[in-house]
């Protein structure tokens, strides 16, 4: 019995291990994954700091989604983001998730179309609003974000 059980358990472990990255990789092209409450990501190297209401971070070999901001708006509220984003490998985008789950891309960059500095604007709708960083496979980037309202997440 043990001879049969051990190989089956090992096969199950290998199968489950192989499934771990599929959600992260699929998120870049699937708004339904981006809109989910949780985050799914893999990061090989991540350095970050939060000071003076500014999130500074550097990531290498990253894939998936990461919530960087949230706000529970009482009414339609204009929001402004000062953003510096440079991608050296892969692709990255910032997405606003409205309370109804609608995903709006605020900014998308790649090494072919790097963005150094931008001021982004959107309207937070009544309810829970979020902004996520969404990274394609093996993305490396440097980013600084500062929001005029809401809560930056570390």
Description of each model-found segment:
Residues 133-152:
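Edge beta-strands of jelly-roll/beta-sandwich modules across compartments, strongly enriched
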Residues 89-106:
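Short, surface-exposed beta-strand/strand-loop-strand elements in extracellular ectodomains
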Residues 1-5, 10:
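Positively charged n-region of N-terminal signal peptides that target proteins for export
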Residues 23-71:
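Transition segment at domain starts
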Residues 14-18:
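C-terminal motif of bacterial Sec signal peptides marking the signal peptidase cleavage site
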Residues 68-79, 121-127:
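Extracellular and analogous surface-interaction loops
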Residues 77-87:
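A short beta-strand element within beta-rich, extracytoplasmic domains
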Residues 105-125:
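Extracellular carbohydrate recognition and processing domains
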